[in-house]
Amino acid sequence: MSDTVLVLDCMNIFIRCYAANPKMSSHGHHIGGTVGFLKTLRGVCNKFSPTKIVAVWEGGGSSRRRSIHPGYKKGKKPKRMNRFYEDDIPDTEKNKNLQIASLISLLKKLPVCQVYVGDCECDDVIGYLCKYTLRNENKVIVSSDQDYYQLLNEKTKIYRLGKKEVVEAEDVIDLTGVSCENYCLAKCLVGDSSDSISGIKGAGFKSVAKRFPVLTTDKEADLMQIFEAASANIDKKIKLYREIVDNFDVVKRNWRLIYLDTSNLSADQMDQINHIIDTFEPTRNKITLMRELIKLGIQNLDVEGLLLSMIYVK
């Protein structure tokens, strides 16, 4: 069996569970985010038998991205609670933060390396891990965030929780119409409304794939290739070409926002990431874990099954 690193997009997983799982503690508090996360963790561990688990938390957002685009992620709406239970479960920041704090504490009793780096986004940390720190390891990113498509290669896969499916590099063209090598570039043209990133008027994945066939190949294109191709066709009736040429500053800005590499991380932040990974020692503290679950009022969680799912972690 080859070694596999599970890379968890923690907030992505937690928010899914928090919004959908109505589980209440014996103290009468909503605890579905915490319980759902642990059950999800057990499930993906059983599926992939990881030898290492890296759980990446949001670090408060990227000031570098906000300096590039002040409207970045502005007004992003949080997921609502499961509507069937809305009247009974308080959907509050306080409850959510308490659940996250509880989850972080519980994960410390498990062989899970938690990574938190201030003033940067989870996406950037995962991008750095995949491209540099863990570049030679087989990795499975657990997230529903499509931004990670740009990281896919023979060493990196994505497990989409919602659809319970594995996405590999060759799958991206069927899912989006463009290759994983050019997904980021295509998204710079299309934009990302969920993060308040405007794109080029009339640009969608289907249309940019049609007008710029290089985006469908496994050869990585660059910004200037798109600009030159659009300029060469600017006199044609298709408006998309002129829109790209006239608004190319938007495309360049979007590249700085969407591309996952080291550009939005400082040297100190990269050192922090490497230090956390290099110095982590896995632990399995069953008794302390069970005591904390009792204290939190979390009942009927299969601790044995959770620990057994991580049997290969070293």
Name each region found by the language model.
Residues 100-101, 144, 184-189:
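Intrinsically disordered, low-complexity segments enriched in polar/charged residues with Gly/Pro
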Residues 2-142, 148-166, 259, 264-279:
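Noncatalytic, basic helical substrate-engagement surface that gates or grips nucleic-acid strands
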Residues 2, 43, 47-57, 71-79, ...:
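Non-catalytic nucleic-acid-binding/docking modules located in mid-to-C-terminal regions
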